[in-house]
From Swiss-Prot:
UniProt source species: Caldanaerobacter subterraneus subsp. tengcongensis (strain DSM 15242 / JCM 11007 / NBRC 100824 / MB4) (Thermoanaerobacter tengcongensis)
Name used for this protein in its record: Co-chaperonin GroES
Highest rank taxon of the organism: Bacteria
Subunit and interaction comment: Heptamer of 7 subunits arranged in a ring. Interacts with the chaperonin GroEL.
Gene name per UniProt: groES
Signal peptide: none
Length: 94
């Protein structure tokens, strides 16, 4: 199944944080930080401002940092994705 975002929405595959600390302690799900990094897997066509479509700045394959509590979580085929507005993306990792 493919997701095709609309407007200025972006689909990001969440990159999970380590489950084991450097000291070897296994972290339970409740102790882990909410992920803030991911890889862009789909991008919408952009939003309209003053009647003109503005293309998104991110593209498929970009690794990005996003706001901790932004977006809508979606689980498809056992994979976790976030559906974000482009404005929820804080930076592109180069």
């Amino acid at each position: 199944m493919r997701l095709k975002p609309l407007g200025d929405r972006v689909v990001v595959k969440v990159i999970q944080s380590e489950e084991v600390t450097k000291g070897g302690v296994i972290l339970p799900g409740t102790a882990k930080e909410k992920p803030q990094q991911g890889e862009v897997v789909a991008v919408g066509p952009g939003q309209y401002i003053d009647g003109k479509r503005v293309e998104p700045e991110v593209k498929v394959g970009d690794r990005v940092i996003f706001s901790k509590y932004a977006g809508t979580e979606v689980k498809l085929d056992g994979e976790e994705y976030l559906l974000l507005r482009e404005s929820d993306i804080l930076a592109i990792i180069e």
